[in-house]
From Swiss-Prot:
It is found in: Cytoplasm. The gene is dnaJ. This is Chaperone protein DnaJ. The keyword Chaperone applies. The J domain is necessary and sufficient to stimulate DnaK ATPase activity. Zinc center 1 plays an important role in the autonomous, DnaK-independent chaperone activity of DnaJ. Zinc center 2 is essential for interaction with DnaK and for DnaJ activity. A zinc finger (CR-type) spans 132-209.
């Protein structure tokens, strides 16, 4: 059966960047890795296909050769031993899946592999995000199997793989290139289990809901992430666990809108307060504060209350609270109130009205000028 195009295997365009290739490989590895699909031969075959594609496309020289000649670039002189003469040694370029993606460095299966990182979205009210909180969460994850202590073996015995001699990797020759890849006999583990654990079926890990207590620092905002080292999935065959990344999302607030460390809100005032001036009380996250409204205040005027915003989670400086005044039209008026407003309105005549309502006069003049230009 002919091989599929490597770009098709990873689901990327031929011009994909290194980062796009890495992300595509990560998605494939997380979905089809044998540790996640024990006993599934089809998933294992797909995983190996993705790994082979990534090993070629992630290396500049091999990618150029593949782009020029396709699979034919690697079909001659294949062997199972060490690198042939004259060919560049690609020895340690390719680690195990978790070494490549998550930063493993040392050779060998136990050094290169680790558990997968886990993500969790934590929703908070604004007050909780501003003040900080300790929250208990429950996450589904893979933990080390207790009966076999993560070894995957019922009796605790494992055998060193005779093919790779425990390294988990073998070197093969493909055309002019020598490269290193996971051992197909032990799937990169370096060991073989003859008597699999009855609890985890040889995986060394079992699914379980883990309960954790998270201390959320004061001042966090949507998009901030909290890393809990070692609280991700247990690593295969007793290797180190991954990390847990908690992403914060702050719910919308009924009064305040957040912009970084600053807060914004609207403060409704009556027409009489706007015209005559007044002192109004406004809510802040720390209690109430006063704003002095000067006479003849218009809708949209901003008042700044310094230090009444959010204390920064990074610099510990405090943001400000910006209060936008909105002059509210009165409703549910009594007959007497309506009559008073009519009498008040009657006092605005001719040029006097323009003097008391400068924005209205400017608007009317603008409309008149527009129509004059349109009809001239």
């Amino acid at each position: 059966m002919s091989k599929r195009d490597y770009y098709e295997v990873l689901g990327v365009a031929r011009g994909a960047s290194d980062e796009e290739l890495k992300k595509a490989y990560r998605r494939c590895a997380m979905k089809y890795h044998p540790d996640r699909n024990p006993g599934d031969a089809a998933a294992e075959a797909t995983f190996k296909e993705c790994k082979e594609a990534y090993e070629v496309l992630s290396d500049g020289n091999k990618r150029r050769a593949y782009d020029a000649h396709g699979h034919a670039a690697f079909e001659h002189g294949m062997g199972g031993g060490g690198g042939g003469p004259g060919g560049p040694d690609m020895g340690d370029i390719f680690g195990d899946i978790f070494g490549n993606i998550f930063g493993g460095g040392a050779a060998g299966p136990r050094a290169a592999r680790r558990g997968a990182d886990v993500g969790y979205v934590l929703e908070l009210d604004l007050e909780e995000a501003v003040a900080g909180i300790e929250r208990r969460i429950e996450i589904p994850t893979l933990i080390e199997c207790e009966p076999c202590h993560g070894s995957g073996s019922e009796d605790g015995k494992v055998e060193v793989c005779a093919t790779c001699h425990g390294r988990g990797q073998v070197r093969i020759q493909r055309g002019i290139f020598a490269m290193q890849q996971s051992c197909p006999h032990c799937d990169g583990r370096g060991t073989l289990i003859q008597n699999p654990c009855k609890t985890c079926h040889g995986a060394g890990r079992v699914e379980e809901d883990k309960v954790l207590s998270i201390k959320v620092p004061a001042g966090v905002d949507t998009g901030d992430r909290i890393r809990l080292a070692g609280e991700g999935e247990a690593g295969p065959a007793g290797t180190p666990p991954g990390d847990l990344y908690v992403e914060v999302r702050v719910r919308e607030h009924a009064i305040f809108q957040r912009d970084g460390d600053d807060l914004h809100c609207e403060v409704p005032i009556r027409i009489s307060q706007a015209a005559l001036g007044d002192t109004v009380r406004v809510a802040t996250l720390g209690g109430e504060a006063e704003i002095r409204i000067p006479a003849e205040t218009q809708t949209g005027k901003l008042f700044r209350l310094r230090g009444k915003g959010v204390r920064s989670v990074r610099s510990r400086s405090e943001g400000d609270l910006y209060c936008r005044v909105v002059v509210e039209t009165p409703v549910n008026l009594t007959a007497d109130q309506r009559e008073l407003l009519k009498q008040f309105e009657a006092t605005f005549t001719g040029e006097d009205a323009r003097k008391h309502s400068p924005k209205s006069a400017t608007f009317i003049d603008g409309v008149k000028g527009f129509w004059d230009r349109m009809t001239s």
